[in-house]
Each structure stands twice: as C-alpha cells, then as structure tokens.
Amino acid sequence: MADPAPALRFSVPLSVTRRGARLARLLAAEQLRSWELPLDPARLIVAELAANAVLHGRVPGRSFRLVLAVTRPATLRIEVTDTRGDRLPVRAPDVGGALAESGRGLLLVGELADRWGVEEGPVPCKTVWAEVGFVPAAER
C-alpha cells in the first residue's frame, strides 16, 4: 500500500544557478523552521542535492524543483528534480582519494540520510531523493 498523501508539503521551482542552489538551502531552512523540524541534517542534504542539480543537471532555460514533504510519521522526504534524466548519479565508492576537492556530495548525502535514491522520469527529468527521520516537536 502506498504512503498516504503528505501532511506537510513544500514545492518550489528554482533557477539552475548557484543563486538558485543557495535559495533552495535558505527556503528549506525557513520551511523547516515553520514546521518546527530540526534544520540539520536536512539543510545539508538540500544544499548537496541542489548543488548537484546546478552542476550536473543544468539545461539552459530550465529550472530544478525542490520538494520537502513529511511522508510518514517523523520522516522528512527531500526531493530535487532536474531536467537531465540522461545523467543519473552513480552510487560509487569514493574514488577521488583523501585529497580530492569535489565529488563527495552524494557520499555525504548517503551518510546523512536514512535512505536515498534516484527516480527516472517523467522524460526528460530525474529526481534525487533522500529521507531523514526526526523527533516530533511534541517529543523534544
């Protein structure tokens, strides 16, 4: 049985620019505050996924979409959708070595999220998603 519709949902299209990636992080933080959810690790995951959309999912004239949703009790789902469905991220070991200056975004997402993955479509899109658990405000 599919999860019921999320009780809380935020969705926004953003430009595929560094400014758009920064705005994704800032808007996510404000939305999490308004929902009284912890900022981290969600804010860090949004930053990494948005940066990847800008660096690897850029198509001139197209945007990327950030979605935040509470999908189950105490689970936040983060989705970033871009229009480069032909460029899927690969779950690979760290091949850059200890001195690499980039290439660790999805490794970081994998460490911070309870689970993450990629969904293809609708053409020409792909969505990279991550889920993180949190302690509800009433229990903090």
Question: Which ranges hold each PLM region?
Answer:
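Bergerat-fold GHKL ATPase/HATPase_c domain
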Residues: 1-41
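Conserved beta-strand-loop-beta-strand hairpin that lines the nucleotide-binding pocket
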Residues: 1-11, 54-140
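Conserved ATP-binding N-box helix of the HATPase_c
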Residues: 37-61
